[in-house]
């Protein structure tokens, strides 16, 4: 077993001993927030981990990588990557009783950049994540209509037909791209602010502020609804979905394994990334949440329970989603067949009702044999149920196009629409609780704001500032900006932060010390599984994912999808390269959090060296006299 531990002078001065820990907890009882009960804590963690990605990204990955075959690498990496890192964050937060900045600077002053990087990522992800909630609210407000506004195309100005853009695409596409986003044809074409989205964005940030105004004291109450209601709605949709025609086609298609996909490196890469992102690791929110626990809370059991719930939710949500997609695909297949039947009837003046789906092929052969010239002039659509099922969709396309189209075909469609968008709202809001915690607590640890400022004021200023920056997502090009941040803000930075977290605990703090801490907190040492995954397996997996991701991204041109009614293959989205200036944005979004870690470490070492330049051992002395938050004592 690897026992390498890097030199870390002054650690004993920065970390309270186990004997002092319970005393500190009692002293903090009146000043530091704590959970009302264990259920609050678990629901908050589940709500933070289980988000929109479980509903609209995991099903897409299953469909793209061999259906049930994708479950194999997903579950393997969930055990070897997700659970160990989740346990580590829970345990280190509970042991040191601080937020992300306080935890890592306590372990070593040069590691304060890890906490700052987590804060940056939480800020940037929250910046666009709440915009998705604003879109959800817009659809929710429009759901109280019969018929639903996206169920049919609007008429043109002359009232002689449908609007051309809608007629060439579909009513759900038109409502999403034109009525909601009023999207431009380029990220460079910013356009103007869409006032209806701005109003919804205002509502979204107002609701979030009310729910987080006093930290866990208010979020702990909200999670009773936001973390449980999605499961109720998912169950209702599953029951309803199973009664719809073709639902089983979707479920069978989802879980039918294509074993050959297991030899595809991208399958394992996507599985590892999905496990990583679905746990909301490296944001700093989970560390803060666990710091409010009792010293002797069983963090090991918590990590296992949250992981099981997270994995189960992904599979459960995929089942629900594909029951609806199966219904949608069957409806489209039936429409396709009926269109072909109508084409044949009109082409040969056949009596209506004579040609059915069952005898269509027989009539085709008869018509072709009777009058091949007339038959050759007819154009038939290709109707294949698997083609409709395999049209992979993820993200906003699944929520605002595929699901909304399926809902329009259900009886009492406004009811199902209201339920669906309530579910998405709760999933998004509960995830934002963790993002806000990942920003507010580090700012308090950094002492940037005056200590006399109440948390309500700090939270309000953060919400207001982020809300103003988020105006960019209300422009005509807002969807393109959101996709850009979604692709780069929450990808590589989180991977690097998580790797640094595990390296810091195992090789800087010391895994043997960490084992003793956990034994003190839960009553027994971590078993061999935790030892192997923390020391070797999990860091190695993250390193491999990073290398694969880096190789893939470096070797391909940055592209994005645009909605252009003048595109020759419209209504397909057109893939175009990003403008050159976007590369600078990518460097800022993905590079700044990553560079914060080494830059702050170098700055800290240089500063300490300069302060002790006259002492041959100045660097060691400087580090050994660091305070708990990583700053030098006078």
UniProtKB/Swiss-Prot annotation:
Q: Which residues lie on this side of the membrane: Cytoplasmic?
A: 1-41, 87-119, 214-221, 290-304, 435-456, 512-531, 603-634
> Which superkingdom heads the taxonomic lineage of this protein's source?
Eukaryota
One of the protein's GO biological processes: response to nutrient
Coiled-coil segments, which residues?
Answer: none
Q: Name one Pfam family in it.
A: SNF
Which ranges does the record mark as transmembrane?
42-62, 66-86, 120-140, 193-213, 222-242, 269-289, 305-325, 414-434, 457-477, 491-511, 532-552, 582-602
Q: Which reaction does it catalyse?
A: L-alanine(in) + Na(+)(in) = L-alanine(out) + Na(+)(out); L-cysteine(in) + Na(+)(in) = L-cysteine(out) + Na(+)(out); L-glutamine(in) + Na(+)(in) = L-glutamine(out) + Na(+)(out); glycine(in) + Na(+)(in) = glycine(out) + Na(+)(out)
Q: Which GO terms describe its cellular component?
A: apical plasma membrane; brush border membrane; plasma membrane
* Protein's UniProt keywords contain Cytoplasm: no
Modified sites of kind Phosphoserine: 17, 627
Give membrane topology per the record. Answer: Multi-pass membrane protein
Residue intervals on the Extracellular side:
63-65, 141-192, 243-268, 326-413, 478-490, 553-581
Does Magnesium show up as a keyword for this record?
A: no
What's a single GO MF annotation on this record? neutral L-amino acid transmembrane transporter activity
Q: Which UniProt keywords apply?
A: Amino-acid transport, Glycoprotein, Membrane, Phosphoprotein, Symport, Transmembrane, Transmembrane helix, Transport
Question: Which sites carry carbohydrate?
Answer: 158, 182, 258, 354, 368
Q: What is its main location?
A: membrane
- Where in or outside the cell? Membrane
Q: Which InterPro entries match?
A: Na/ntran_symport, Neutral_aa_SLC6, SNS_sf
Q: What induces it?
A: By high salt intake in SHR rats. Reduced level upon high salt intake in Wistar Kyoto rats.
Complexes and interactors: Interacts in a tissue-specific manner with ACE2 in small intestine and with CLTRN in the kidney. Interacts with CLTRN; this interaction is required for trafficking of SLC6A19 to the plasma membrane and for its catalytic activation in kidneys. Interacts with ACE2; this interaction is required for trafficking of SLC6A19 to the plasma membrane and for its catalytic activation in intestine. Interacts with ANPEP; the interaction positively regulates its amino acid transporter activity.
Function of the molecule: Transporter that mediates resorption of neutral amino acids across the apical membrane of renal and intestinal epithelial cells. This uptake is sodium-dependent and chloride-independent. Requires CLTRN in kidney or ACE2 in intestine for cell surface expression and amino acid transporter activity.
Name by which UniProt lists this protein: Sodium-dependent neutral amino acid transporter B(0)AT1
Taxonomic source organism: Rattus norvegicus
């Amino acid at each position: 077993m690897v026992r390498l531990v890097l030199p870390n002078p002054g650690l004993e001065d920065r970390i309270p001993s186990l004997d002092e820990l319970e005393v500190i907890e009692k002293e903090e009882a009146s000043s530091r927030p704590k959970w009302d009960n264990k259920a609050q804590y678990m629901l908050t963690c589940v709500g933070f981990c289980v988000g929109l990605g479980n509903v609209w990204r995991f099903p897409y990955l299953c469909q793209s990588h061999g259906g049930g075959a994708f479950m194999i690498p997903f579950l393997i990496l969930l055990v070897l990557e997700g659970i160990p890192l989740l346990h580590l964050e829970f345990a280190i937060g509970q042991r040191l009783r601080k937020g992300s900045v306080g935890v890592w600077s306590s372990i070593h002053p040069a590691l304060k950049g890890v906490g700052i990087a987590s804060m940056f990522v939480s800020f940037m992800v929250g910046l666009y994540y709440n915009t998705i909630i604003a879109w959800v609210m817009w659809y929710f407000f429009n759901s109280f209509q019969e018929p639903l506004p996206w169920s049919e195309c609007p008429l043109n100005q002359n009232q002689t037909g449908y609007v051309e853009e809608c007629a060439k695409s579909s009513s759900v596409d038109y409502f999403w791209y034109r009525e909601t986003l009023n999207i431009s044809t380029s990220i460079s074409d910013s356009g103007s602010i869409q006032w209806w989205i701005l109003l919804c964005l205002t509502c979204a940030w107002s609701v979030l502020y009310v729910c987080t105004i006093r930290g866990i004291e208010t979020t702990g109450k909200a999670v009773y609804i936001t973390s449980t209601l999605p499961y109720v709605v998912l169950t209702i949709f599953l029951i309803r979905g199973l009664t719809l025609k073709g639902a089983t086609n979707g479920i069978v298609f989802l879980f039918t394994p294509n074993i050959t996909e297991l030899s595809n490196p991208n399958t394992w890469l996507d599985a590892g990334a999905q496990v990583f992102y679905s746990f909301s690791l490296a944001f700093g929110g989970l560390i803060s949440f666990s710091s409010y626990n009792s010293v002797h809370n069983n963090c090991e059991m918590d990590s296992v329970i949250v992981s099981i719930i997270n994995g189960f939710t992904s599979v459960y949500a995929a089942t629900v989603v594909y029951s609806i997609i199966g219904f949608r695909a069957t409806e489209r297949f039936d429409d396709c067949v009926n269109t072909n039947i109508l084409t044949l009837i009109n082409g040969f003046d056949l009596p209506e009702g004579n040609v059915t789906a069952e005898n269509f092929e027989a009539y085709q052969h008869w018509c072709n044999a009777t009058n091949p010239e007339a038959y050759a002039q007819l154009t038939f659509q290709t109707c294949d149920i698997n083609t409709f099922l395999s049209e992979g969709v993820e993200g906003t396309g699944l929520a605002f196009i595929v699901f909304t189209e399926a809902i329009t075909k259900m009886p009492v469609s406004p009811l199902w629409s209201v339920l669906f968008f309530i579910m998405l709202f709760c999933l998004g809001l509960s995830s934002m609780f963790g993002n806000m915690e990942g920003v507010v607590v580090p700012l308090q640890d950094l002492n940037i704001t005056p200590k006399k400022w109440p948390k309500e004021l700090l939270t309000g200023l953060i919400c207001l500032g982020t809300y103003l920056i988020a105006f960019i997502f209300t422009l005509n090009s807002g969807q393109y900006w959101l996709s850009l941040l979604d692709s780069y803000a929450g990808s590589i930075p989180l991977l690097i932060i998580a790797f640094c977290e595990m390296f810091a605990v195992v090789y800087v703090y010391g895994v043997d010390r960490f084992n003793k801490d956990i034994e003190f907190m839960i009553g027994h040492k971590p078993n061999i599984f935790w030892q192997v995954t923390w020391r070797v397996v999990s860091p190695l997996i993250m390193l491999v994912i990073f290398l694969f991701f880096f190789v893939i991204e470096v070797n391909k041109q940055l592209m994005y999808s645009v909605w252009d009614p003048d595109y020759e293959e419209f209504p397909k989205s057109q893939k175009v390269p990003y403008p050159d200036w976007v590369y600078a944005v990518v460097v800022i979004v993905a590079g700044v959090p990553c560079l914060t870690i080494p830059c702050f470490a170098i700055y800290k070492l240089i500063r300490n060296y300069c302060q002790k330049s006259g002492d041959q051992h100045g660097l060691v002395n400087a580090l050994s006299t660091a305070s708990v938050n990583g700053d030098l004592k006078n």
